[in-house]
Amino acid sequence: MYDVIIIGKGPAGISASLYAKRAGLSALIIGKDLGALEKAKEVENYYGITASGKEIAELGIKQAEKLQIPIKTEEVVSIICDETFTIETNQNKYESKAVLLATGTNRIQPKIKGIKEFEGKGISYCAVCDGFLYRSQDVAVLGSGEYAIHEAQELANVAKSVTILTNGKSNIKLQESLKDKIIINEKQIKEFIGDKIIRKVKFTDDTELQIRGIFVAEGVATSIDFARKLGARIAQNRIVVDSKMETNIPGLYAAGDCTGGLLQISTAVAEGAIAGTEIIKFIRENKEEK
């Protein structure tokens, strides 16, 4: 049995693992991929480093490997809590005394013609990172959930216009205060068109929308599914945690994008550090009680 199992091998999860391991805890990291960070072409707002998201993620993983923290490239399918935690993946079962949910936000890439072609050429995955590049221009957000609204709100502060492209979905609801700032377009998308950069969106009814930038914001935090099933509090599609990054379930922590707030590498690393140090205290206190 591990002291802590960390679900997610992004900045939050790796950060927490470094603290846990150096404090003498047995830790296991489980993660299927690097998530949205892998798609970031260049990150220029992280302290001391200008590199691609993938390069930053790989540096963190190397740190964990140097400390001999085991990392399993597996998909978690269920988490059960009964005094201790049982984590089932598509390959194995593991047990731990504490769990950190740090899978970030599962940003789904829709199968739309042109989306791969224009990645980094007008198609982005982070409004806070790249929004300033589109000051006073027409932009769009591709998505239909809370994350899409979050990105649209960020862009509304700098862009000339912001359109949420739901790609045929009609379940998105805006607060009254946002209806004057954000346009909802529920048409199904046929393809993205451009030359060296993206220029327009073509819909299946052959109408077009001139656009200078598109921000992909499909999906919600995958950690939420596990948190909800375990009975953790959820608010606005984010896991509710206290200042210790702990949920209302003893031993269950969450850090990074799945807790909401500023969705940045720097905050994910910080939350992971807090979670890691608090998990250390949790494990030590429980040992003393026994």
Language model segments and positions:
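FAD-site-proximal beta/loop scaffold in flavoenzymes
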Residues: N106, K111, E117-L133, E218-L262, ...
